A protein has these predicted regions:
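Single conserved hydrophobic/aromatic residue that forms the stacking wall/gate
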Residues: 1-13
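Short, amphipathic alpha-helical segments
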Residues: 6, 29-30
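Glycine-rich phosphate/diphosphate-binding loops and the adjacent beta-loop-alpha structural elements
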Residues: 18-29, 38-161
Length: 166
């Protein structure tokens, strides 16, 4: 997200008369800690993510649209991080608000995907702002080159304990 935020800011400098929105959908189902980590993208050379939405808090689509409109009115491009599991007040996942085929995994769980695309389409249709949706999906699971020393150590220890328990 740091790289994405930085690139988005560079585009903003070149194209400030026409704000754009990039919505990144991050895995996590009902736990938003990965999405919350998007706040860590802020640094001295990068403003970071503008808006972050987690599944632990009810998603208010009207408030979301108002915030996007407010930021866009300043002529700024923006980056928004949303958890795949964000839900509206009636308990439905945001992606369920779109007209799509519903998928379930081998365990019968709803396959969570499409919140970013739904929101991008809504922003484009209602606010006329160029918007992109990015669903990292499998890519975020396969980024072993980004693994921290802590992650490697914990995975090694858990694997060792599993072998001993078997």
């Amino acid at each position: 997200l740091h790289l994405l935020s930085r690139r988005q800011r560079q585009m903003c400098i070149r194209d400030s008369d026409y704000p754009t929105v990039t919505i990144v959908e991050i895995m996590g189902r009902n736990a938003g800690w990965l999405t919350a980590a998007a706040a860590l993208a802020k640094s001295d050379d990068c403003e970071g993510v503008d808006l972050i939405y987690l599944p632990e808090k009810v998603f208010d689509i009207d408030h979301f649209m108002a915030r996007v409109k407010e930021i866009a009115a300043k002529g700024r491009s923006m980056v928004i991080a949303v958890s795949e599991g964000i839900k509206v007040a009636d308990g439905r996942y945001v992606f369920e608000l779109s007209e799509h085929v519903e998928f379930v995994d081998a365990f019968g769980h709803k396959q969570l995907a499409g919140s970013a695309k739904f929101l991008a389409n809504k922003i484009g249709a209602e606010l006329g702002i160029k918007t992109r949706a990015i669903e990292l999906s499998t890519l975020q699971r396969c980024a072993a080159h980004m693994t921290s020393r802590t992650d490697i150590t914990e995975a090694f220890n858990v694997g060792g304990a599993a072998v001993k328990a078997a």
